[in-house]
A protein has these predicted regions:
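Internal catalytic domains of large membrane-associated glycosyltransferases
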Residues: 1-50, 54-110, 178-350
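Alpha-helical bilayer-embedded segments of polytopic membrane proteins, i.e.
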Residues: 110-168
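Juxtamembrane/interface segments at transmembrane-helix termini
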Residues: 137-143, 162-184, 210, 234
Length: 350
């Protein structure tokens, strides 16, 4: 009974890490990333080694050593950083290099050929259209050449939709799902990976501005971290004049919400921001509007973070100097909420 209790108390993750020869070798990854990854990602690498070892008919240790050799050689030769990570040769395009190093020259990737996808798509669409026309002929329908061409053209889109749906379903069932490796950020986002979550949106009125700021608040409540920041990037609605009477009310609403949340959750420290851009006259549209819409907001926000002056942000709720070290930007649509703990997972994957 005592022995059973002792077994129950063992951390099998730690036990495996301390006894697995493959695990110990992987920890010498030249890129230094493997030891920083979460357990699920490490486990994905180990399972990939098992599958490749069976496919190549070599033992797991030999395969791991070859992958490490390729990563080390890439580092010594000054190749791009991702090629110095052992994972590149276990789950990515480097599998081909690994098979060549083992003198196997086996095509070992699980990628669905783009050319094959297009070919199947076209052939199946033609078959469906032809089958429908043939069936119509059997039932007694008679068409002129022109009518056949028109009928075929009209059926191409719906037939192709059916084919695409069937191909996507088949691929999802036949091909293994590829896990996206992630860093272990269970202790929080580090200082060198500061991230900001932004919502680029058009602000028609003060009420909508408050709603979007509160949406950022909900995202924060499910993703609390000292190195996570939040911002609403707003454009005023298009108008025939450069400024409208309701813009000041919108700005006031954004400022008020940013101040409220910073005081409530961070004792005044700036983690929530409201920014809006001045409108630029667009001669093609004949109105004043935000430059390049959503794309423009994001591009100019990145310029702003880099300290550049080529942007049209004219209103900021507070000094953005605290954002100069931001490394990642996560963009949410105006109707999207950030799921609980998903921000940390995304940062770990990036």
């Amino acid at each position: 009974i005592s022995a059973l209790r002792s077994i129950e108390g063992i951390s099998w993750k730690k036990f495996f890490d301390s006894t697995s020869t493959v695990e110990k070798k992987l920890q010498t990854d030249p890129h230094g990333t493997y030891t920083k990854m979460d357990f699920k990602s490490k486990d994905y690498y180990r399972h990939s080694i098992e599958k490749l070892a069976r496919k190549f008919q070599v033992d797991e240790i030999t395969l791991t050593e070859k992958a490490l050799y390729l990563a080390t050689r890439a580092k010594e030769e000054g190749k791009r950083a991702y090629r110095t990570h052992v994972g590149y040769y276990l789950i990515d395009d480097g599998i081909k290099d690994l098979s060549n190093e083992l003198n196997l020259h086996v095509k070992a990737n699980n990628k669905f050929s783009e050319g094959l996808y297009i070919t199947i798509n076209i052939v199946c669409t033609i078959i469906i259209v032809s089958a429908i026309l043939a069936f119509s002929y059997v039932l007694g329908a008679r068409f002129s050449t022109g009518q056949l061409i028109v009928a075929a053209l009209l059926m191409i889109v719906p037939a192709n939709e059916i084919v695409v749906a069937l191909i996507n379903w088949s691929v999802s069932k036949l091909k293994p799902i590829r896990h996206v490796p992630k860093l272990d950020l269970s202790e929080g986002i580090p200082e060198n990976k500061k991230t900001i979550i932004v919502i680029p949106a058009i602000l028609p009125n003060a009420k909508r501005t408050e709603e979007l700021m509160k949406q950022l608040e909900v995202s924060y409540l499910g993703n609390k971290d000292k190195n996570l920041y939040f911002a609403l990037l707003g454009d005023f609605k298009d108008s025939k004049v450069e400024k409208t009477s309701d813009e000041e009310e919108i700005i006031e609403a954004g400022f008020k919400e940013a101040l409220r949340m910073n005081n409530k959750y961070f004792n005044g420290e700036k983690h929530f921001f409201f920014l809006s851009r001045k409108k630029i006259y667009n001669p093609k549209e004949g109105v004043y509007m935000g430059k390049e819409r959503k794309r423009g907001k994001l591009m100019e926000f990145m310029n702003l973070l880099r300290g550049e002056e080529n942007h049209t942000f004219s209103v900021m709720s507070s000094y953005i100097g605290t954002l100069k070290d931001i490394k990642y930007i996560i963009t949410l649509d105006a109707d999207t909420f950030m799921p609980r703990d998903s921000a940390i997972k995304l940062v770990g994957a990036m």
